[in-house]
Regions:
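N-terminal binding-site loop/beta-alpha segment at the start of enzyme catalytic domains
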Residues: 1-131, 205, 211
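Glycine/proline-rich, positively charged
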Residues: 135-225
Length: 225
């Protein structure tokens, strides 16, 4: 699915709720503004996709909830690749396809997702350790020393892989906002200098992803930042 959230698209979306939304419900976020360009117009609340089982019943419930939320005035949708072992992103992708059939365009919706936690794939039925070795270690996407706390990585090759997987799961070619997910997970595992080096390398990759059009903005999703 082409394109991304745009100022024109999000304003068109907000205009549908001109008489029903509370004053100030839609606004221009400073953090998603580029000098000289109009900012997107986003709802004051969004819908997240964190909890639930990675099964078809939950998939359908999430898809229906996202469609209902967007039809009700919410145009910010958040996820992460590890949420429900990639199924939350896929449920968003299904919702986007359904909404397109209902006349709601991709450029009206602001999508954010995250990468950093190493996650299995709910669509894979084999051993998770074998999956990890096949998908990440053997191809050289991850080295053992890249992994912190047994669950987290933010090396450029890993983030590139995760972003590409997220784009496929979502069925889009650009994510509006991409977060490094809880990078502080690594703070107690590696020296501070090494942590900062890893974070700089992650940002360098994310800058390249902006340049190639795979993401629009990036940042950190952190509890302890």
């Amino acid at each position: 699915m082409a394109t991304r959230a745009t100022a024109e698209g999000t304003r068109r979306y907000a205009a549908r709720f001109a008489t029903s939304a509370a004053p100030g419900h839609f606004s221009e976020p400073v953090s998603c503004s580029i000098p000289g360009e109009p900012a997107p117009l986003l709802s004051s609340i969004g819908i997240g996709t964190y909890l639930g089982q990675p099964d078809e019943v939950t998939d359908r419930s999430y898809t229906a909830a996202i469609v209902a939320a967007v039809q009700g005035g919410i145009n910010v949708v958040d996820s992460a690749i590890n949420y429900r072992y990639q199924q939350s992103e896929r449920s968003i992708g299904a919702a986007l396809r359904e909404m397109r059939e209902k006349g709601i365009a991709r450029e009206e919706i602001f999508l954010s997702t995250k990468g950093g936690y190493i996650t299995p794939d709910a669509a894979e039925t084999g051993d998770p350790q074998a999956y990890f070795e096949r998908e990440y270690l053997r191809p050289g996407i991850l080295r053992a020393e890249d992994v912190a706390a047994g669950c987290h990585a933010m090396s450029p090759s890993f983030l590139e892989n995760q972003l590409d997987r997220s784009l496929k799961n979502l069925g889009v070619d650009c994510v509006d906002l991409y977060y490094v997910h809880n990078p502080e997970t690594q703070l107690g595992e590696v020296p501070r200098e090494e942590f900062l080096r890893r974070l700089r390398e992650a940002f360098t990759f994310l800058e390249s992803a902006v340049a190639t059009g795979k993401i629009r903005f990036y940042g950190l999703a952190t509890w302890n930042g």
